[in-house]
């Protein structure tokens, strides 16, 4: 169900909005309307009455951008995880950018994979033709087919944090959020070096934490990308660079996962449900508990549940 938010503002702000969204204006304007604009995952409609309606998955984020400049803040907009100074510009969907995403963070078995992809604006129609979209709406076979083509089309940087290293870093006090931040930053830095002297118009990270927290996680890193970096939840729907990164990250994860299943000598389930507890218990019986760190993320509750099944 799409969100719908209305704010009350004034003619000056509405004129600023029209200017901001000038590349996204719709030829159609509803009765009593001043303009209608369509940006990724949000439609903005401004009315002569001073009301502005935001509709779509990113309605809260877009509304929050203008709520701060509106002179009538009494129509409060609910605080959104997308409400921050790192929100992408309205025109980002048509820009040449780097997008990054991660896969495997919610799976007990298997590694964490992070990929950064550079998509030139001219490549956007081709990516659409290849079927690039939110990887959650694609099965493993579709992911593989699209990924194999993407590998030859877009520059990318792919990182894999294997389970043993993941557990070692986690034991040293690095939570999953910090590990994700480190990998995203590394993948982005690697890719920017790879595509130099080409400079993207921006970097869009599929948001997994507040941007200020992300940069706190990177405080001790020598190289941190800060220039024109944007964060957005559901980044796949904001720019195809994130959708492409998501597909390549999942492709890498599936390949690693299959190798892990071969190593285990048994099929390993994805996710973190009950079937995972049962498989982990079988794996402990088969290979011994000392081998478990090679296959799983030990801090998940599934570890304790698996051992409980063996009692």
Curated annotation (Swiss-Prot):
Manner of cofactor binding, per the entry note: Manganese or magnesium. Binds 1 divalent metal ion per monomer in the absence of substrate. May bind a second metal ion after substrate binding.
EC number: 3.1.26.4
Main localization of the protein described in the UniProt heading: cytoplasm
A biological process term (GO) from this entry: DNA replication, removal of RNA primer
Domain of life: Bacteria
CDD domains given in the database record: RNase_HII_bacteria_HIII_like, RNAse_HIII_N
The keyword Hydrolase is assigned to this record: yes
EC top class named in words: hydrolase
Compartments in which it is found: Cytoplasm
GO CC list: cytoplasm; ribonuclease H2 complex
Domain (RNase H type-2) ranges: 95-311
Keywords annotated in UniProt: Cytoplasm, Endonuclease, Hydrolase, Magnesium, Metal-binding, Nuclease
Gene3D superfamilies from the UniProt entry: Ribonuclease H-like superfamily/Ribonuclease H, TATA-Binding Protein
One Pfam match: DUF3378
Required co-factors: Mn(2+); Mg(2+)
InterPro entries: RNase_HII/HIII (IPR001352), RNase_HII/HIII_dom (IPR024567), RNase_HIII (IPR004641), RNase_HIII_N (IPR024568), RNaseH-like_sf (IPR012337), RNaseH_sf (IPR036397), TBP_dom_sf (IPR012295)
Reaction catalyzed: Endonucleolytic cleavage to 5'-phosphomonoester
Entry's family note: Belongs to the RNase HII family. RnhC subfamily.
Family annotation (NCBIfam families): rnhC
Described purpose of this protein according to its UniProt entry: Endonuclease that specifically degrades the RNA of RNA-DNA hybrids.
Protein name stated in the entry: Ribonuclease HIII
């Amino acid at each position: 169900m799409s969100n719908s938010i209305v704010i009350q503002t004034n003619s000056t702000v509405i004129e600023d909005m029209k200017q901001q969204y000038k590349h996204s204006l719709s030829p159609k304007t509803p009765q009593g309307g001043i303009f209608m604009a369509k940006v990724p995952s949000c439609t903005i409609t401004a009315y002569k009455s001073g009301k502005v309606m935001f509709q779509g998955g990113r309605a809260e984020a877009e509304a929050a951008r203008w709520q701060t400049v509106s002179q009538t803040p009494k129509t409060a907009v609910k605080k959104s995880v997308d409400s921050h100074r790192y929100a992408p510009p309205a025109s980002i969907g048509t820009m040449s950018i780097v997008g990054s995403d991660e896969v495997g963070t919610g799976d007990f078995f298997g590694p964490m994979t992070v990929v950064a992809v550079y998509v030139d604006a001219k490549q956007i129609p081709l990516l659409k033709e290849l079927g690039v979209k939110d990887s959650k709406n694609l099965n493993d076979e579709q992911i593989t087919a699209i990924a194999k083509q993407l590998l030859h089309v877009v520059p990318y940087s792919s990182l894999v944090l294997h389970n043993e290293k993941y557990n070692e870093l986690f034991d040293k006090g690095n939570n999953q959020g910090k590990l994700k931040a480190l990998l995203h930053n590394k993948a982005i830095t690697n890719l920017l070096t790879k595509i130099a002297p080409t400079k993207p118009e921006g970097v869009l990270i599929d948001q997994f934490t507040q941007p200020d927290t992300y940069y706190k996680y990177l405080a001790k890193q020598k190289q941190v990308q800060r220039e024109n970096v944007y964060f957005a939840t559901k980044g796949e729907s904001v720019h195809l660079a994130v959708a492409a990164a998501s597909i390549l990250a999942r492709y890498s994860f599936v390949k690693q996962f299959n190798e892990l299943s071969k190593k285990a000598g048994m099929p390993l389930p994805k996710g973190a449900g009950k079937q995972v507890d049962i498989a982990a218990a079988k794996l402990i019986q088969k290979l011994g508990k000392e081998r478990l760190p090679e296959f799983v993320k030990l801090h998940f509750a599934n570890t304790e549940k698996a051992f409980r099944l063996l009692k």
